[in-house]
Amino acid sequence: MQAVALEQALKRHYARNQRWGFIWAIWMAVLWGAWYVPGTALWFEHPYVDIPANATALRLTATAVMTWVHAIGVFVWLLLWNGTLGKIRDYGRTMVRFRRISKWYALASLCGGPMAIFGSYMAMTYAGPVFAAISSLLFPVVGTVIAALWFKERITRRAALGMSIVILGGLAVYGPGLFGQLQSTQSDAWLGYAGGIMSALGWGAEGAVAARAMDVSDPDVGIQCRFSFEVFFWGLLILPALTFFTDIPVARLLVDTLANGRALLWIFLAASTHAYCYTSWYKATSLIGVSRTGGIGNLYAMLALIFIACFTLQLPAWYFLIGLALSITGSFVMFGESAESVASLRDVTSGNQAMVEAE
C-alpha cells in the first residue's frame, strides 16, 4: 500500500511540475513577444532616430547604451519582485558565493547581455523587429545541445524531432536573406543577420548555464544576480572602454537618453516585460529543463508577430510565416511528452561527474 501511495504521489508531483513549468514557459513567451514592441519603438526616439543609417559605429554604440539602460531597468523591476518575495538577503548571500554559485550567473549574463540582448537590438535595427523575433527561434536547439553535452540533460526522440523541425524553420527564415532574396535598402543589413545569430547562440548558452546555476540556487534570486553582473559588465567595463579608446560620444548618448521622457517610457516598458519574461524563463527551466522550456518559449515569435502587426498594421513576408509555422510545430512536438518523461531530466551519474569536472 505504501509503495502504491508513493507512486501516486510521485505522479502527482511530476504532473504538477510539468503543469507549472508549462505555465511559466507560456508567460515567458507572452512577455518576450511583447518586448519587441517597445524595444523597436525606442529606435524612433531621440537620440537614436537622429543617428544616420550609415554611421555604423555610432549606431552600435547607441545599441550598447540602450542595452545598459535597459539592464538597469530590468534590475530595478527584479529588485521590486524579490523585495516583495522577501528574498533580498538570499540575493546578497548568493552574490558573494562567486566560486560556487554566482560565477555561473556572471557567465550567463555575458551570454545573455552583451551577446543575446545586444544582438537582438542589432537585429531590430538592421533587419527589422520581425526578423529579430523569429531569428532567435534557434536558441532552444543551442541550449539543448549544450545541456546534453555538459550536464547530460536527457533528449528523447520526440525532443530531437522537434529540434529538427525548429532548425528547418530557422533555415526558412535565414535562407532568403542569405541568398539575396530579402531586398533590404540598408547596406549594413548583414549586421542584422549577425545580431540574429548572436541572440540565438547567446540565449541558448544562457539557458544551459543558468540551469547549471539553479541546481544550487533559487531562480528568483538567480535572475537578480544575472542582471547585476550585466549592469556591471556594461557600466564598468564595456562603455568606459568605448569612452576612453574611441571618440564616440558615449556620455552624450547616455545623457540624451535619460533626458528624453518618451525614450525612458519605452525603456520602462521593455524592462518590465523582459524582467518578468526572464523570471518565467528561469522558473520554467528549473521545473521542466532547458529543451522543453525553450521549445514552448518559442511561441514568443508568434506572439511578437501579433503584437508588431497590431502596432504597425504590417504583415510579415511569406517566408517568415513558413519559418514561423515550422518552428512553432517543432516547439509543440518537443513539449508533447508525458509527465513521467520530465521526471528525470538528466543522466544523474554522468551529469554529476561533468559538473564536478566543471568546478
Question: Predicted regions span which residues?
Answer:
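Glycine-/small-residue-enriched transmembrane alpha-helix faces in small-molecule transporters
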Residues: 1-68, 183-212, 350-359
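Hydrophobic transmembrane alpha-helices of multi-pass small-molecule transport proteins
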Residues: 2-7, 158-177, 298, 307, ...
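Hydrophobic alpha-helical transmembrane segments of multi-pass integral membrane proteins
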Residues: 19, 23, 27-30, 56-84, ...
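Helix-helix packing/entry segments at the starts of transmembrane helices
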Residues: 27, 113-117, 129-138, 166, ...
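Specific transmembrane alpha-helical segments of multi-pass solute transporters/efflux pumps
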Residues: 31-34, 91-130, 172, 270-288
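Hydrophobic/aromatic residues within transmembrane alpha-helices
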Residues: 42, 66, 123, 149-155, ...
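Membrane-interface helix termini and inter-helical loops of multi-pass transporters
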Residues: 43-58, 175-188, 243-259, 314-316
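C-terminal transmembrane-helix exit sites in multi-pass transporters
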Residues: 55, 140-164, 302-321
